[in-house]
Amino acid sequence: MLSRSGSQGRRCLATLSQIAYQRNDDDEEEAARERRRRARQERLRQKQEEESLGQVTDQVEAHVQNSAPDEESKPATANAQVEGDEEAALLERLARREERRQKRLQEALERQKEFDPTITDGSLSVPSRRMQNNSAENETAEGEEKGESRSGRYEMEETEVVITSYQKNSYQDAEDKKKEEKEEEEEEEKLKGGNLGENQIKDEKIKKDKEPKEEVKNFLDRKKGFTEVKAQNGEFMTHKLKQTENAFSPSRSGGRASGDKEAEGAPQVEAGKRLEELRRRRGETESEEFEKLKQKQQEAALELEELKKKREERRKVLEEEEQRRKQEEADRKAREEEEKRRLKEEIERRRAEAAEKRQKMPEDGLSEDKKPFKCFTPKGSSLKIEERAEFLNKSVQKSGVKSTHQAAVVSKIDSRLEQYTNAIEGTKASKPMKPAASDLPVPAEGVRNIKSMWEKGSVFSSPSASGTPNKETAGLKVGVSSRINEWLTKSPDGNKSPAPKPSDLRPGDVSGKRNLWEKQSVDKVTSPTKV
Protein backbone atom coordinates (compact mmCIF):
# COMPACT_ATOMS: atom_id res chain seq x y z
CA MET A 1 0.00 0.00 0.00
CA LEU A 2 2.79 2.37 0.86
CA SER A 3 4.50 1.66 -2.44
CA ARG A 4 1.24 2.26 -4.30
CA SER A 5 0.62 5.52 -2.45
CA GLY A 6 4.20 6.64 -3.14
CA SER A 7 3.89 5.79 -6.82
CA GLN A 8 0.54 7.61 -7.02
CA GLY A 9 2.10 10.66 -5.32
CA ARG A 10 4.94 10.66 -7.81
CA ARG A 11 2.48 10.36 -10.66
CA CYS A 12 0.45 13.27 -9.28
CA LEU A 13 3.56 15.41 -8.99
CA ALA A 14 4.55 14.50 -12.53
CA THR A 15 1.10 15.34 -13.84
CA LEU A 16 1.04 18.65 -11.94
CA SER A 17 4.43 19.63 -13.34
CA GLN A 18 3.26 18.63 -16.80
CA ILE A 19 0.10 20.69 -16.33
CA ALA A 20 2.14 23.70 -15.23
CA TYR A 21 4.42 23.44 -18.25
CA GLN A 22 1.48 22.99 -20.59
CA ARG A 23 -0.32 25.93 -19.00
CA ASN A 24 2.72 28.13 -19.51
CA ASP A 25 3.03 27.00 -23.11
CA ASP A 26 -0.69 27.53 -23.69
CA ASP A 27 -0.50 31.00 -22.14
CA GLU A 28 2.35 31.89 -24.45
CA GLU A 29 0.48 30.60 -27.48
CA GLU A 30 -2.67 32.45 -26.46
CA ALA A 31 -0.72 35.67 -25.97
CA ALA A 32 0.83 35.26 -29.41
CA ARG A 33 -2.59 34.66 -30.95
CA GLU A 34 -3.96 37.73 -29.16
CA ARG A 35 -1.08 39.84 -30.45
CA ARG A 36 -1.69 38.69 -33.98
CA ARG A 37 -5.42 39.38 -33.63
CA ARG A 38 -4.74 42.91 -32.33
CA ALA A 39 -2.33 43.53 -35.16
CA ARG A 40 -4.99 42.50 -37.66
CA GLN A 41 -7.56 44.73 -35.97
CA GLU A 42 -5.12 47.66 -35.98
CA ARG A 43 -4.46 47.17 -39.67
CA LEU A 44 -8.19 47.09 -40.36
CA ARG A 45 -8.71 50.29 -38.33
CA GLN A 46 -5.93 52.04 -40.17
CA LYS A 47 -7.50 51.00 -43.44
CA GLN A 48 -10.85 52.31 -42.32
CA GLU A 49 -9.32 55.63 -41.25
CA GLU A 50 -7.51 55.96 -44.54
CA GLU A 51 -10.71 55.16 -46.36
CA SER A 52 -12.65 57.73 -44.28
CA LEU A 53 -9.99 60.33 -45.05
CA GLY A 54 -10.27 59.43 -48.69
CA GLN A 55 -14.04 59.78 -48.50
CA VAL A 56 -13.75 63.27 -46.92
CA THR A 57 -11.35 64.43 -49.58
CA ASP A 58 -13.58 62.97 -52.26
CA GLN A 59 -16.64 64.75 -50.86
CA VAL A 60 -14.74 68.08 -50.81
CA GLU A 61 -13.75 67.59 -54.44
CA ALA A 62 -17.23 66.41 -55.47
CA HIS A 63 -17.82 69.66 -57.42
CA VAL A 64 -14.70 68.89 -59.47
CA GLN A 65 -15.45 65.27 -60.37
CA ASN A 66 -18.80 63.52 -60.09
CA SER A 67 -17.36 60.00 -60.41
CA ALA A 68 -15.71 60.08 -56.98
CA PRO A 69 -18.69 58.69 -54.95
CA ASP A 70 -18.82 55.59 -57.14
CA GLU A 71 -15.15 54.90 -56.54
CA GLU A 72 -15.48 55.51 -52.80
CA SER A 73 -18.31 53.01 -52.43
CA LYS A 74 -16.15 50.17 -53.83
CA PRO A 75 -13.49 50.14 -51.08
CA ALA A 76 -16.15 50.32 -48.37
CA THR A 77 -17.86 47.24 -49.74
CA ALA A 78 -14.47 45.50 -50.11
CA ASN A 79 -13.60 46.26 -46.49
CA ALA A 80 -16.96 44.99 -45.31
CA GLN A 81 -16.46 41.79 -47.25
CA VAL A 82 -12.95 41.33 -45.81
CA GLU A 83 -14.24 41.79 -42.27
CA GLY A 84 -17.05 39.31 -42.86
CA ASP A 85 -14.62 36.76 -44.28
CA GLU A 86 -12.29 37.14 -41.31
CA GLU A 87 -15.13 36.65 -38.83
CA ALA A 88 -16.35 33.58 -40.71
CA ALA A 89 -12.84 32.12 -40.80
CA LEU A 90 -12.42 32.77 -37.08
CA LEU A 91 -15.71 31.04 -36.28
CA GLU A 92 -14.79 28.06 -38.44
CA ARG A 93 -11.43 27.78 -36.77
CA LEU A 94 -13.02 27.88 -33.32
CA ALA A 95 -15.52 25.20 -34.33
CA ARG A 96 -12.77 22.92 -35.63
CA ARG A 97 -10.76 23.49 -32.48
CA GLU A 98 -13.78 22.61 -30.33
CA GLU A 99 -14.35 19.40 -32.27
CA ARG A 100 -10.73 18.36 -31.83
CA ARG A 101 -10.84 19.10 -28.12
CA GLN A 102 -13.98 17.02 -27.71
CA LYS A 103 -12.31 14.14 -29.51
CA ARG A 104 -9.25 14.40 -27.27
CA LEU A 105 -11.53 14.51 -24.22
CA GLN A 106 -13.26 11.29 -25.26
CA GLU A 107 -9.91 9.58 -25.90
CA ALA A 108 -8.61 10.75 -22.53
CA LEU A 109 -11.71 9.38 -20.80
CA GLU A 110 -11.27 6.01 -22.52
CA ARG A 111 -7.60 5.84 -21.53
CA GLN A 112 -8.40 6.79 -17.95
CA LYS A 113 -11.06 4.07 -17.82
CA GLU A 114 -8.50 1.55 -19.02
CA PHE A 115 -6.03 2.58 -16.28
CA ASP A 116 -8.64 3.10 -13.52
CA PRO A 117 -11.96 1.26 -14.09
CA THR A 118 -13.57 2.94 -11.02
CA ILE A 119 -13.94 6.19 -12.96
CA THR A 120 -17.39 6.59 -14.52
CA ASP A 121 -18.85 9.00 -16.99
CA GLY A 122 -20.73 10.75 -14.22
CA SER A 123 -17.54 11.62 -12.35
CA LEU A 124 -16.21 13.37 -15.39
CA SER A 125 -19.48 14.78 -16.65
CA VAL A 126 -18.97 18.09 -14.85
CA PRO A 127 -15.79 19.00 -16.74
CA SER A 128 -17.40 17.97 -20.01
CA ARG A 129 -20.51 20.05 -19.30
CA ARG A 130 -18.37 22.93 -18.24
CA MET A 131 -16.41 22.62 -21.45
CA GLN A 132 -19.61 22.56 -23.48
CA ASN A 133 -20.96 25.60 -21.65
CA ASN A 134 -17.68 27.40 -22.12
CA SER A 135 -17.64 26.52 -25.80
CA ALA A 136 -21.20 27.85 -26.21
CA GLU A 137 -20.34 31.00 -24.31
CA ASN A 138 -17.26 31.37 -26.48
CA GLU A 139 -19.30 31.17 -29.63
CA THR A 140 -21.77 33.79 -28.40
CA ALA A 141 -19.00 35.97 -26.98
CA GLU A 142 -17.08 35.92 -30.24
CA GLY A 143 -20.20 37.01 -32.00
CA GLU A 144 -20.89 39.84 -29.53
CA GLU A 145 -17.56 41.11 -28.26
CA LYS A 146 -13.98 40.05 -28.91
CA GLY A 147 -12.86 40.84 -25.38
CA GLU A 148 -15.28 38.36 -23.87
CA SER A 149 -14.13 35.74 -26.32
CA ARG A 150 -10.65 36.02 -24.84
CA SER A 151 -11.91 35.21 -21.33
CA GLY A 152 -13.96 32.34 -22.70
CA ARG A 153 -10.92 30.95 -24.45
CA TYR A 154 -8.90 31.18 -21.22
CA GLU A 155 -11.60 29.17 -19.43
CA MET A 156 -11.58 26.62 -22.20
CA GLU A 157 -7.81 26.36 -21.97
CA GLU A 158 -8.07 25.81 -18.21
CA THR A 159 -10.58 23.02 -18.69
CA GLU A 160 -8.30 21.54 -21.33
CA VAL A 161 -5.36 21.62 -18.91
CA VAL A 162 -7.44 19.85 -16.24
CA ILE A 163 -8.45 17.17 -18.70
CA THR A 164 -4.91 16.66 -19.99
CA SER A 165 -3.85 15.61 -16.47
CA TYR A 166 -5.58 12.30 -17.19
CA GLN A 167 -3.76 11.84 -20.47
CA LYS A 168 -0.55 9.82 -20.76
CA ASN A 169 0.44 10.65 -24.28
CA SER A 170 0.83 14.28 -25.47
CA TYR A 171 1.94 13.46 -28.99
CA GLN A 172 -1.49 14.15 -30.48
CA ASP A 173 -1.67 17.55 -28.78
CA ALA A 174 1.63 18.55 -30.32
CA GLU A 175 0.39 17.53 -33.76
CA ASP A 176 -2.83 19.51 -33.28
CA LYS A 177 -0.87 22.57 -32.22
CA LYS A 178 1.31 22.28 -35.27
CA LYS A 179 -1.75 22.04 -37.48
CA GLU A 180 -3.30 25.11 -35.84
CA GLU A 181 -0.11 27.09 -36.30
CA LYS A 182 0.02 26.10 -39.95
CA GLU A 183 -3.60 27.17 -40.42
CA GLU A 184 -2.95 30.51 -38.74
CA GLU A 185 0.11 31.07 -40.91
CA GLU A 186 -1.93 30.30 -44.01
CA GLU A 187 -4.61 32.73 -42.90
CA GLU A 188 -2.01 35.41 -42.28
CA GLU A 189 -0.57 34.82 -45.72
CA LYS A 190 -4.04 35.12 -47.18
CA LEU A 191 -4.60 38.37 -45.29
CA LYS A 192 -1.27 39.64 -46.52
CA GLY A 193 -2.27 38.74 -50.02
CA GLY A 194 -5.57 40.59 -49.50
CA ASN A 195 -3.70 43.59 -48.13
CA LEU A 196 -1.47 43.59 -51.17
CA GLY A 197 -4.53 43.56 -53.39
CA GLU A 198 -6.06 46.41 -51.43
CA ASN A 199 -2.84 48.39 -51.68
CA GLN A 200 -2.83 47.93 -55.42
CA ILE A 201 -6.44 49.12 -55.57
CA LYS A 202 -5.53 52.16 -53.49
CA ASP A 203 -2.59 52.98 -55.71
CA GLU A 204 -4.78 52.78 -58.78
CA LYS A 205 -7.39 54.92 -57.06
CA ILE A 206 -4.77 57.54 -56.11
CA LYS A 207 -3.55 57.63 -59.68
CA LYS A 208 -7.07 58.07 -60.95
CA ASP A 209 -7.65 60.84 -58.41
CA LYS A 210 -4.49 62.65 -59.42
CA GLU A 211 -5.41 62.72 -63.09
CA PRO A 212 -8.68 64.71 -62.68
CA LYS A 213 -6.99 66.96 -60.13
CA GLU A 214 -4.32 67.84 -62.62
CA GLU A 215 -6.97 68.46 -65.25
CA VAL A 216 -8.85 70.71 -62.81
CA LYS A 217 -5.65 72.62 -62.05
CA ASN A 218 -5.02 73.17 -65.71
CA PHE A 219 -8.58 74.29 -66.24
CA LEU A 220 -8.35 76.76 -63.35
CA ASP A 221 -5.07 78.11 -64.64
CA ARG A 222 -6.74 78.83 -67.93
CA LYS A 223 -9.46 80.73 -66.23
CA LYS A 224 -7.90 83.73 -64.58
CA GLY A 225 -10.99 84.83 -62.85
CA PHE A 226 -11.09 81.92 -60.43
CA THR A 227 -7.73 82.51 -58.74
CA GLU A 228 -9.16 83.92 -55.54
CA VAL A 229 -11.77 81.21 -55.33
CA LYS A 230 -9.02 78.69 -55.86
CA ALA A 231 -7.04 80.18 -53.00
CA GLN A 232 -10.08 80.28 -50.75
CA ASN A 233 -11.03 76.75 -51.68
CA GLY A 234 -7.46 75.61 -51.09
CA GLU A 235 -7.33 77.25 -47.68
CA PHE A 236 -10.70 75.80 -46.82
CA MET A 237 -9.64 72.34 -47.95
CA THR A 238 -6.36 72.42 -46.10
CA HIS A 239 -8.04 73.69 -42.97
CA LYS A 240 -10.67 70.98 -43.21
CA LEU A 241 -8.08 68.29 -43.82
CA LYS A 242 -6.09 69.47 -40.83
CA GLN A 243 -9.20 69.34 -38.68
CA THR A 244 -9.99 65.79 -39.79
CA GLU A 245 -6.41 64.67 -39.20
CA ASN A 246 -6.42 66.24 -35.75
CA ALA A 247 -9.76 64.59 -35.02
CA PHE A 248 -8.66 61.11 -36.04
CA SER A 249 -5.03 61.01 -35.00
CA PRO A 250 -4.98 62.05 -31.31
CA SER A 251 -8.28 60.53 -30.28
CA ARG A 252 -8.08 57.12 -31.89
CA SER A 253 -4.74 56.22 -33.29
CA GLY A 254 -2.51 57.87 -30.66
CA GLY A 255 -3.79 56.15 -27.53
CA ARG A 256 -4.49 52.83 -29.19
CA ALA A 257 -1.11 52.68 -30.88
CA SER A 258 0.74 53.43 -27.66
CA GLY A 259 -1.29 50.90 -25.68
CA ASP A 260 -0.89 48.24 -28.33
CA LYS A 261 2.83 48.85 -28.53
CA GLU A 262 3.18 48.50 -24.77
CA ALA A 263 0.98 45.41 -24.75
CA GLU A 264 2.94 43.89 -27.59
CA GLY A 265 6.34 44.87 -26.19
CA ALA A 266 5.94 43.25 -22.75
CA PRO A 267 5.11 39.72 -24.00
CA GLN A 268 7.86 39.96 -26.56
CA VAL A 269 10.37 40.81 -23.85
CA GLU A 270 9.10 37.95 -21.70
CA ALA A 271 9.21 35.58 -24.64
CA GLY A 272 12.75 36.70 -25.42
CA LYS A 273 13.78 36.13 -21.81
CA ARG A 274 12.23 32.69 -21.81
CA LEU A 275 13.95 31.82 -25.05
CA GLU A 276 17.28 32.95 -23.65
CA GLU A 277 16.66 30.93 -20.50
CA LEU A 278 15.76 27.85 -22.52
CA ARG A 279 18.82 28.29 -24.71
CA ARG A 280 21.01 28.72 -21.65
CA ARG A 281 19.60 25.61 -20.01
CA ARG A 282 19.95 23.64 -23.20
CA GLY A 283 23.53 24.82 -23.58
CA GLU A 284 24.26 23.87 -19.98
CA THR A 285 22.77 20.40 -20.42
CA GLU A 286 24.64 19.90 -23.67
CA SER A 287 27.89 21.06 -22.07
CA GLU A 288 27.31 18.74 -19.11
CA GLU A 289 26.60 15.82 -21.42
CA PHE A 290 29.67 16.67 -23.46
CA GLU A 291 31.80 16.80 -20.32
CA LYS A 292 30.38 13.47 -19.17
CA LEU A 293 31.12 11.89 -22.53
CA LYS A 294 34.61 13.34 -22.50
CA GLN A 295 35.18 12.03 -18.98
CA LYS A 296 33.92 8.59 -19.98
CA GLN A 297 36.25 8.57 -22.97
CA GLN A 298 39.17 9.53 -20.75
CA GLU A 299 38.27 6.80 -18.26
CA ALA A 300 38.00 4.27 -21.09
CA ALA A 301 41.39 5.38 -22.43
CA LEU A 302 42.92 5.02 -18.95
CA GLU A 303 41.43 1.56 -18.54
CA LEU A 304 42.78 0.58 -21.94
CA GLU A 305 46.24 1.83 -21.00
CA GLU A 306 46.10 -0.09 -17.73
CA LEU A 307 45.06 -3.24 -19.55
CA LYS A 308 47.91 -2.78 -22.01
CA LYS A 309 50.37 -2.28 -19.15
CA LYS A 310 49.13 -5.37 -17.34
CA ARG A 311 49.33 -7.40 -20.53
CA GLU A 312 52.87 -6.16 -21.17
CA GLU A 313 53.90 -6.96 -17.59
CA ARG A 314 52.39 -10.42 -17.87
CA ARG A 315 54.21 -11.01 -21.13
CA LYS A 316 57.48 -9.88 -19.58
CA VAL A 317 56.96 -12.15 -16.57
CA LEU A 318 56.25 -15.10 -18.87
CA GLU A 319 59.36 -14.33 -20.92
CA GLU A 320 61.49 -14.07 -17.77
CA GLU A 321 60.11 -17.36 -16.49
CA GLU A 322 60.81 -19.00 -19.84
CA GLN A 323 64.37 -17.64 -19.88
CA ARG A 324 64.93 -18.72 -16.29
CA ARG A 325 63.59 -22.18 -17.06
CA LYS A 326 65.84 -22.47 -20.11
CA GLN A 327 68.83 -21.26 -18.07
CA GLU A 328 68.08 -23.77 -15.32
CA GLU A 329 67.76 -26.52 -17.92
CA ALA A 330 71.08 -25.53 -19.49
CA ASP A 331 72.76 -25.37 -16.05
CA ARG A 332 71.35 -28.75 -15.14
CA LYS A 333 72.62 -30.26 -18.38
CA ALA A 334 76.02 -28.67 -17.83
CA ARG A 335 76.16 -30.03 -14.28
CA GLU A 336 75.18 -33.48 -15.51
CA GLU A 337 77.85 -33.36 -18.20
CA GLU A 338 80.41 -32.18 -15.68
CA GLU A 339 79.39 -34.90 -13.25
CA LYS A 340 79.62 -37.53 -15.96
CA ARG A 341 83.01 -36.27 -17.04
CA ARG A 342 84.22 -36.16 -13.45
CA LEU A 343 82.96 -39.66 -12.77
CA LYS A 344 84.58 -40.89 -15.95
CA GLU A 345 87.87 -39.28 -14.99
CA GLU A 346 87.57 -40.74 -11.50
CA ILE A 347 86.93 -44.18 -12.93
CA GLU A 348 89.87 -43.84 -15.29
CA ARG A 349 92.06 -42.62 -12.45
CA ARG A 350 91.01 -45.46 -10.20
CA ARG A 351 91.59 -47.95 -12.96
CA ALA A 352 95.06 -46.50 -13.58
CA GLU A 353 95.83 -46.57 -9.85
CA ALA A 354 94.59 -50.14 -9.56
CA ALA A 355 96.71 -51.15 -12.53
CA GLU A 356 99.74 -49.47 -11.01
CA LYS A 357 99.06 -51.13 -7.67
CA ARG A 358 98.67 -54.49 -9.32
CA GLN A 359 101.96 -53.96 -11.09
CA LYS A 360 103.77 -52.76 -7.97
CA MET A 361 102.34 -55.11 -5.37
CA PRO A 362 104.12 -58.33 -6.48
CA GLU A 363 107.46 -56.55 -6.57
CA ASP A 364 107.26 -54.02 -3.76
CA GLY A 365 104.99 -55.97 -1.40
CA LEU A 366 107.93 -57.83 0.19
CA SER A 367 111.16 -56.55 1.58
CA GLU A 368 114.50 -57.51 0.13
CA ASP A 369 115.38 -60.10 2.76
CA LYS A 370 111.88 -61.66 2.88
CA LYS A 371 111.46 -62.24 -0.84
CA PRO A 372 111.02 -65.91 -1.73
CA PHE A 373 113.77 -67.73 -3.53
CA LYS A 374 113.24 -68.00 -7.21
CA CYS A 375 114.79 -70.73 -9.22
CA PHE A 376 116.22 -69.30 -12.36
CA THR A 377 115.47 -71.75 -15.08
CA PRO A 378 115.99 -71.14 -18.76
CA LYS A 379 112.30 -70.40 -19.24
CA GLY A 380 110.80 -70.13 -15.75
CA SER A 381 107.42 -71.51 -16.82
CA SER A 382 106.35 -72.81 -13.42
CA LEU A 383 106.96 -69.47 -11.70
CA LYS A 384 104.92 -67.70 -14.31
CA ILE A 385 102.05 -70.08 -13.80
CA GLU A 386 102.17 -69.54 -10.06
CA GLU A 387 102.25 -65.78 -10.47
CA ARG A 388 99.31 -65.93 -12.85
CA ALA A 389 97.33 -68.09 -10.45
CA GLU A 390 98.15 -65.70 -7.62
CA PHE A 391 97.00 -62.72 -9.69
CA LEU A 392 93.74 -64.43 -10.62
CA ASN A 393 93.07 -65.34 -7.01
CA LYS A 394 93.63 -61.73 -5.91
CA SER A 395 91.34 -60.40 -8.59
CA VAL A 396 88.60 -62.82 -7.55
CA GLN A 397 88.91 -61.79 -3.91
CA LYS A 398 88.90 -58.04 -4.70
CA SER A 399 85.91 -58.13 -7.00
CA GLY A 400 83.86 -60.19 -4.53
CA VAL A 401 82.81 -62.79 -7.06
CA LYS A 402 80.39 -65.32 -5.58
CA SER A 403 80.83 -69.03 -5.52
CA THR A 404 78.38 -69.42 -8.42
CA HIS A 405 80.99 -67.93 -10.76
CA GLN A 406 83.84 -70.14 -9.52
CA ALA A 407 83.32 -72.75 -12.20
CA ALA A 408 83.73 -70.17 -14.96
CA VAL A 409 86.88 -68.81 -13.29
CA VAL A 410 88.30 -72.32 -12.93
CA SER A 411 87.62 -73.05 -16.59
CA LYS A 412 89.42 -69.89 -17.58
CA ILE A 413 92.39 -70.78 -15.38
CA ASP A 414 92.44 -74.29 -16.85
CA SER A 415 92.42 -72.90 -20.33
CA ARG A 416 95.23 -70.55 -19.46
CA LEU A 417 97.19 -73.39 -17.82
CA GLU A 418 96.70 -75.52 -20.89
CA GLN A 419 97.91 -72.68 -23.07
CA TYR A 420 101.00 -72.24 -20.92
CA THR A 421 101.75 -75.93 -20.86
CA ASN A 422 101.31 -76.19 -24.59
CA ALA A 423 103.69 -73.29 -25.06
CA ILE A 424 106.24 -74.93 -22.78
CA GLU A 425 105.92 -78.21 -24.60
CA GLY A 426 106.39 -76.44 -27.91
CA THR A 427 109.54 -74.75 -26.71
CA LYS A 428 110.96 -77.89 -25.17
CA ALA A 429 110.18 -80.07 -28.13
CA SER A 430 112.66 -78.26 -30.30
CA LYS A 431 115.51 -78.90 -27.81
CA PRO A 432 117.39 -82.22 -27.54
CA MET A 433 116.40 -84.53 -24.77
CA LYS A 434 118.74 -84.78 -21.82
CA PRO A 435 119.01 -87.56 -19.35
CA ALA A 436 117.18 -86.77 -16.15
CA ALA A 437 118.61 -87.39 -12.75
CA SER A 438 117.38 -90.59 -11.24
CA ASP A 439 117.58 -89.42 -7.70
CA LEU A 440 114.97 -86.56 -8.09
CA PRO A 441 111.26 -87.27 -7.91
CA VAL A 442 108.82 -86.10 -10.54
CA PRO A 443 107.41 -82.73 -9.45
CA ALA A 444 104.34 -83.13 -11.64
CA GLU A 445 102.32 -84.44 -8.74
CA GLY A 446 102.11 -81.01 -7.11
CA VAL A 447 100.84 -79.44 -10.31
CA ARG A 448 98.30 -82.22 -10.71
CA ASN A 449 97.13 -81.65 -7.17
CA ILE A 450 96.63 -77.92 -7.77
CA LYS A 451 94.75 -78.63 -10.98
CA SER A 452 92.53 -81.15 -9.30
CA MET A 453 91.85 -78.66 -6.52
CA TRP A 454 90.71 -76.02 -9.03
CA GLU A 455 88.57 -78.56 -10.87
CA LYS A 456 86.90 -79.84 -7.70
CA GLY A 457 86.34 -76.33 -6.27
CA SER A 458 88.29 -77.11 -3.08
CA VAL A 459 90.77 -74.32 -3.53
CA PHE A 460 89.78 -72.69 -0.26
CA SER A 461 90.34 -75.90 1.71
CA SER A 462 93.75 -77.01 2.87
CA PRO A 463 95.52 -79.11 0.24
CA SER A 464 95.97 -82.77 1.00
CA ALA A 465 99.11 -84.51 -0.13
CA SER A 466 98.06 -87.27 -2.50
CA GLY A 467 101.51 -88.44 -3.26
CA THR A 468 104.10 -90.02 -1.05
CA PRO A 469 106.42 -87.56 0.55
CA ASN A 470 110.05 -87.64 -0.28
CA LYS A 471 112.77 -86.38 1.93
CA GLU A 472 114.46 -84.42 -0.79
CA THR A 473 111.34 -82.64 -2.02
CA ALA A 474 109.76 -82.09 1.37
CA GLY A 475 111.05 -78.57 1.68
CA LEU A 476 109.85 -77.60 -1.80
CA LYS A 477 106.35 -79.00 -1.20
CA VAL A 478 106.08 -77.27 2.12
CA GLY A 479 106.97 -73.95 0.53
CA VAL A 480 104.40 -74.26 -2.27
CA SER A 481 101.58 -75.39 0.01
CA SER A 482 102.26 -72.68 2.52
CA ARG A 483 102.20 -70.06 -0.18
CA ILE A 484 98.88 -71.36 -1.54
CA ASN A 485 97.38 -71.30 1.94
CA GLU A 486 98.55 -67.74 2.37
CA TRP A 487 96.95 -66.74 -0.93
CA LEU A 488 93.64 -68.21 0.15
CA THR A 489 93.53 -66.92 3.72
CA LYS A 490 95.01 -63.44 3.48
CA SER A 491 92.79 -60.32 3.19
CA PRO A 492 92.82 -58.11 0.04
CA ASP A 493 94.32 -55.15 1.82
CA GLY A 494 96.60 -57.06 4.13
CA ASN A 495 100.36 -57.29 3.70
CA LYS A 496 101.86 -60.39 2.21
CA SER A 497 103.54 -62.62 4.74
CA PRO A 498 106.94 -63.77 3.50
CA ALA A 499 107.13 -67.37 2.47
CA PRO A 500 109.57 -69.51 4.45
CA LYS A 501 112.82 -69.95 2.70
CA PRO A 502 113.83 -73.54 2.44
CA SER A 503 116.95 -74.18 4.44
CA ASP A 504 118.07 -77.20 2.44
CA LEU A 505 118.54 -75.20 -0.74
CA ARG A 506 121.88 -73.66 -1.34
CA PRO A 507 123.41 -71.69 -4.21
CA GLY A 508 125.42 -74.70 -5.20
CA ASP A 509 122.29 -76.72 -5.89
CA VAL A 510 121.22 -74.57 -8.81
CA SER A 511 122.43 -77.06 -11.31
CA GLY A 512 120.53 -79.80 -9.55
CA LYS A 513 117.33 -77.81 -9.52
CA ARG A 514 117.86 -77.09 -13.17
CA ASN A 515 118.02 -80.73 -13.91
CA LEU A 516 114.92 -81.22 -11.77
CA TRP A 517 112.84 -78.73 -13.77
CA GLU A 518 114.10 -80.15 -17.04
CA LYS A 519 113.09 -83.60 -15.91
CA GLN A 520 109.66 -82.26 -14.98
CA SER A 521 109.18 -80.72 -18.41
CA VAL A 522 110.27 -83.98 -20.07
CA ASP A 523 107.75 -85.90 -18.03
CA LYS A 524 105.01 -83.53 -19.07
CA VAL A 525 105.86 -84.02 -22.69
CA THR A 526 106.02 -87.77 -22.41
CA SER A 527 102.80 -88.12 -20.44
CA PRO A 528 100.22 -85.65 -21.87
CA THR A 529 97.30 -87.65 -20.57
CA LYS A 530 98.27 -86.98 -16.99
CA VAL A 531 98.25 -83.26 -17.52
Curated annotation (Swiss-Prot):
The modification Phosphothreonine is found at T468. Residues 392-424 are annotated as: Strong actin-binding. High-molecular-weight caldesmon (h-caldesmon) is predominantly expressed in smooth muscles, whereas low-molecular-weight caldesmon (l-caldesmon) is widely distributed in non-muscle tissues and cells. Not expressed in skeletal muscle or heart. Residues 41-50, 93-116, 143-156, 200-227, 271-297, 305-372, 503-522 have a biased composition (Basic and acidic residues). GO terms for biological process: actin filament bundle assembly; female pregnancy; muscle contraction. There is a cross-link at K384 (Glycyl lysine isopeptide (Lys-Gly) (interchain with G-Cter in SUMO2)). Coiled coil: none annotated. Residues 21-379, 458-531 are annotated as: Disordered. The N-terminal part seems to be a myosin/calmodulin-binding domain, and the C-terminal a tropomyosin/actin/calmodulin-binding domain. These two domains are separated by a central helical region in the smooth-muscle form. Belongs to the caldesmon family. This is Non-muscle caldesmon.
